[in-house]
C-alpha cells in the first residue's frame, strides 16, 4: 500500500493515525458511493482513486495543537476536534452490515476465489467482523487497530502477498507430487545402475584374476623350458664316460635297450609329426615361439576340441538324415493311401456302371 499517495507520513506508526478519531455522518453517503463505484476483485479500482479525489473527500486536517510521537504512538488532540483519514484508511459505513453467517460465507468465497490480504484490509465487512461487543453493537474499529506496531506499515507489502489463490496452491501441490515421483524414479534408476556397475566390476576383477593365473602358468612353463635348454647346452661339452663291457652279453643287452629307446622315440616323433600336420590343416596361422613353433599339448587340445566338434556335427547330420528318412517313408505311405483310395473309387464306379448295364439288359429281355 502506497501511503505517500494519500499524504500519509510513513515515519508515524499506524496506531498514531488511528487514535481519537471522530466520524462525520454527512460523509457516509459519499464514502458509500466511493466503495460502490469499484468492482469486488483483487484490483479494486473504486478504491484506488487519484490524489485529487482523495483530497476532495477529506477536507478536514489535523488541528494546530496536535502532536504525534512515533515512539509512543499517541496524539494530544482536543476532544472536540474532528478530522478525516486518508481514503485508504477512512471509516466505513456501518449500515447494512451482514450477519455472522453471511460474513463467514463471504470470507470463505473470497478465500476460494484467491482473494489477497489487501482485500481483507480494505473490505468494510471484514473490518466489522470482529468489532462487536457482547450486545451486538459495533466497537470502535480504530481502537482495535491501535495495537498494530510501526513494523506493520513497513511489512504491509509482504502481508499483502502472503495469500495465494487456491488454484495456485493446488498447482503447487501437484508440482510437488510430480517432483517427488521424478526424484523417486531417479533414485530407482540410480540404484539399478549402481547394482549393474558393481556386477561389472566383479566380472572385471574375476577376469583380471584369471589373466594373472594364466600368466603365472605361462611364465612357469617358460622358465622350465629355459632351464632345460640351458642344462642341455652346458652338458653337451662334457664327454660321456666309457666303460668296457665284461662280456658280449652285456654289450648285447645295452645295444638292445638303446635300440628299443630309439624305436620308441621314433614312434613319438611320428605321432608328433602327424599332430603337427593336422594342426597345420586346422589352423595354418600358428604363432612362432622361441623354443619351437608348435606345442604338443596345445595341439592335442586343439585336436580333441576339433574331434568333439566333428562328432557333434555327425550326430546332428545323422538326426537330420533319420528325420528326413522318416518323413520320406511317411510321404510314401500317404501317396500309397491316396492311390488306394483313387483305385477303390474307380472300382466302385465300374461296379455301379456294370450293375446299371445288367439291369438295362434284364429290362430289355423282359
Swiss-Prot record:
Localization in the cell: Cytoplasm; Nucleus, Nucleolus
GO biological process terms held by the UniProt record: meiotic cell cycle; negative regulation of pseudohyphal growth; premeiotic DNA replication; sporulation resulting in formation of a cellular spore
Keyword Metal-binding part of the UniProt annotation: no
Domain of life per record: Eukaryota
Keyword field: Cytoplasm, Meiosis, Nucleus, Sporulation
Major location (coarse): cytoplasm
Phenotype upon loss of function: Mutant is sporulation defective and fails to perform premeiotic DNA synthesis. Increases the rate of degradation of KAR4 protein. Decreases the level of VIR1 protein.
Region (Disordered): 28-47, 60-85
Further details from the record: Present with 3400 molecules/cell in log phase SD medium.
Protein family per UniProt: Belongs to the fl(2)d family.
Function: Component of the MIS complex, a complex that mediates N6-methyladenosine (m6A) methylation of meiotic mRNAs and is required for initiation of meiosis, progression through the meiotic divisions and sporulation.
Oligomeric and partner information: Component of the MIS (mRNA N6-methyladenosine (m6A) methylation) complex, at least composed of IME4, KAR4, MUM2, SLZ1, and VIR1. Interacts with VIR1.
Protein name as it appears in the record: Protein MUM2
